[in-house]
Amino acid sequence: MLEPDDIALFRGAVKGVKALKQDKFIAPRQKMSKKKSTLRDIREKEDTLFYFSDEYEPLLNEESAVRYLREGEDSHILKQLRRGDFSPELFLDLHGLTKEQAKIELASLLQACENEHVYCASVMTGYGSYILKRQIPRWLVQHPKVRALHQAPKAWGGDAAILILFEV
């Protein structure tokens, strides 16, 4: 609390000050309603979810480290991802989520990366029963904005995480 001397000093400093009457300025109404905003977000997520098919089986080597490079990209990018030269700006932790919940969260991450112009993100799948660890790369390779992905280096999660490089 304040000391009595401090209170007296403050009162002496503001003595004679009059409160302003607010009658001239009217705050502008907010242009966009919350309904429209959430509707737009839902549409963007649906657009992103469009790319995630559970039936698609890409040619990924599931016995070694997870990695993918989009056709036409420089192979040096995979080496940079493996070494941790790209540091992720956004992180997504999927521990404890179901496959459907993970798909929605992954779509949200991709949309956030696109909206915020983020070029690298990390998805933590965890160890668990390996369902998400196998499925996440299958979904990611279907998205046109994903340039490359690789199992994260130990500093960013190791076996339990995937680094993703996006087209910005």
Curated annotation (Swiss-Prot):
Protein keywords: Endonuclease, Hydrolase, Nuclease, RNA-binding, rRNA-binding
GO molecular function: RNA endonuclease activity; rRNA binding
Record keyword Zinc present: no
EC code(s) of this entry: 3.1.-.-
Any matching Pfam family: Smr
Domain Smr span(s) in chain numbering: 92-167
PROSITE patterns cross-referenced by the UniProt entry: SMR
Signal peptide residues on this chain, from the entry's feature table: none
GO BP annotations, alphabetical order: rescue of stalled ribosome
Record carries keyword Hydrolase: yes
Role summary: Acts as a ribosome collision sensor. Detects stalled/collided disomes (pairs of ribosomes where the leading ribosome is stalled and a second ribosome has collided with it) and endonucleolytically cleaves mRNA at the 5' boundary of the stalled ribosome. Stalled/collided disomes form a new interface (primarily via the 30S subunits) that binds SmrB. Cleaved mRNA becomes available for tmRNA ligation, leading to ribosomal subunit dissociation and rescue of stalled ribosomes.
Assembly and oligomerization: Associates with collided ribosomes, but not with correctly translating polysomes.
Family to which this protein belongs: Belongs to the SmrB family.
Protein name (Swiss-Prot/TrEMBL): Ribosome rescue factor SmrB
Organism of this sequence: Pasteurella multocida (strain Pm70)
Taxonomic placement: Bacteria, Pseudomonadati, Pseudomonadota, Gammaproteobacteria, Pasteurellales
Gene symbol of the encoding locus: smrB
